[in-house]
Amino acid sequence: MTVNARGPEGRTDGAVPEGAGGMKKLAGISLAALGVVFGDIGTSPLYAIRECFHGDYGIAASNANILGVLSLLFWALILIVSLKYLTFIMRADNEGEGGILALTALIIGQSIKKKKDRWVLVSIGLFGASVLLGEAMITPAISVLSATEGLQIIAPAFADMVIPATVVILAGLFLFQHNGTARLGALFGPIILLWFFCLGTLGIIQIIQYPQILEAVMPWYGINFLLNNQLHGFLVLGAVFLAVTGAEALYADMGHFGRRPIRLTWVLFVLPALLLNYFGQGAFLLASPEASSHPFYALVPSWAMIPMVLLATVATVIASQALITGVYSITQQAMQLGYLPRLTVTHTSASHIGQIYVPAANWALMAATIGLVLGFGSSSRLAAAYGASMTTTMLISTILFFFVARDLWKWRPPVLWALVSLFAVVDLSFFGASMSKLFHGAWFPLAVGLLMFTLMNTWKQGRRLLMRQLQDRTLTVDGFLDSLALQEPQRVPGQAVYLTANPDIVPIALLHNLRHNKVLHSEVALFHFSSERVPRVPNSKKVEFVRLKDGFTQVVARYGFLEYPNIRQVLELANALGLNFKPEAISFFLSREKIVADEKTKILPSRKKMFALMARNALSATAYYGLPSGQVIEIGVQVQI
């Protein structure tokens, strides 16, 4: 999964200089990417093969079926990860950033002009991001659970310890989040490097003994498997797909590590290690089909079982950490794009801006993840839910990619339709197989996606109605300034800043202040923060202001969906351009809206209540914009929607 999961090393554009220094930097970035980007897909060998032969729709571990499953798995990794994501979708970046929301913002901002088309694509992208949140709840649960299940292989008496151990590990992981991962993050890459080395080593030992397993790279083994097993074979695709879960993370983390390090790490190290392990599991099953209930741990010598269970547990925790950080990132993006209310965000690193902590998201994720462990009870039962979330996300990525290639890249229709049709057939096959498990857990990520989509859509629509109501009760800036010339109010010395959602409209707080106090400050600045559909706005383009008449100034501050508006930074940039407002002497005026339901509006009553609840629990503008609380005056406004 994950959209824009942040690692410990800070952002890079992936540009690596030539020479020895460049190669050293490339190696360092690639090692860092191992710990953040590839943790999810790298822990799939714990359960992917097992679910094909031992899951809800597990098939008999005959030689033909083993070769067929491995063939399907091999080509899934090649077509979905290597071809679709690394070759094509990673080209569709939004100023270097990847992920569903970044991709949606790119399409909407640059290519789609019709309002109806924009709404449809925004809804598709928003639902994809919502399903990703459901996946983020499942991934830590299934990953850590699949690792700790090795305890019962060490000794059956440990079986009762699996669930408690998993809950303790997950609870510790979430409770640690507020400390950040700056120090521990340096260990992520080397640990995952060791994990992949062990994967490859365990696999190659078995392949040497049964080299005939390599015949599975031939696609006709997979085709024959589907033809011979028909419906049963199709249903097994849902388990085969588990091998490519985490592919979305390669695209989502592109802005952090760059295309080249991710591609090289995949081709030269990750893909070979995964294939060696999967084929090694297949080779072992050729000789011992009865091991289908635990093929991964069956590869491990008895003397190495305890260290391997510990390493697997640490690897799954690292993979979970990357996804948790990804949830913080997608929450941040949704807030900046106006789909979620303001939430508390803490920066956990003074040197790396991408390292953030969102308490509300953390506690919700913790409750859901531990609830899934307790509710499902095993990684095998969670597998159905996991596959459903990822197939939905990948299908949506294909749809969005189509519009990028058609409208931005102007691809010729024959080439475009041929490629997208290939991706769509693969995606729909896996999606259909995963949906067959709808009542076995696949409903969960879809339910979470629908809930989050409803919340985000409700907030966006509610804010739109709220702004419309406020604009109907105020004046344009030009009209207001003209009215001052007719009836000049008393002016008092000082500087005042009013925050406004629309730079051309007078803030309601200003009108209420003037109506009740009958005075205006001698210098008044109307500050508007504009969220752009790009990841970041350079400082040179972040702030601009216009001097109006009668001591008024209009200030517009632009920031990207990966940035946070900060009043001190904006004032510094504006003062450098000649604004001359003293931060310590400014009075900041804000309006605080009280939402009241109005039967005349078309929005459903339940959604009105939902919006009002979200508005009441949103972080205050004072905290969100970093305003000095001792200089803030809030004016209450009642608004009907």
From Swiss-Prot:
Protein localization: Cell inner membrane
Catalytic activity field: K(+)(in) + H(+)(in) = K(+)(out) + H(+)(out)
Membrane topology note: Multi-pass membrane protein
UniProt keyword Transmembrane helix, yes or no: yes
InterPro entries: K+_transporter, K_trans_C, K_trans_N, Kup
Cellular component GO terms, alphabetical: plasma membrane
Predominant cellular place of this UniProt entry's protein: membrane
Ion transport in keyword set: yes
Pfam families (UniProt xref): K_trans, K_trans_C
Single GO term (MF): potassium ion transmembrane transporter activity
Transmembrane segments: 29-49, 66-86, 119-139, 156-176, 185-205, 231-251, 266-286, 298-318, 356-376, 384-404, 415-435, 438-458
Keyword line: Cell inner membrane, Cell membrane, Ion transport, Membrane, Potassium, Potassium transport, Symport, Transmembrane, Transmembrane helix, Transport
Protein family according to the UniProt entry: Belongs to the HAK/KUP transporter (TC 2.A.72) family.
PANTHER family: LOW AFFINITY POTASSIUM TRANSPORT SYSTEM PROTEIN KUP, OSMOTIC STRESS POTASSIUM TRANSPORTER
Role according to the record: Transport of potassium into the cell. Likely operates as a K(+):H(+) symporter.
Protein name per its UniProtKB record: Probable potassium transport system protein Kup
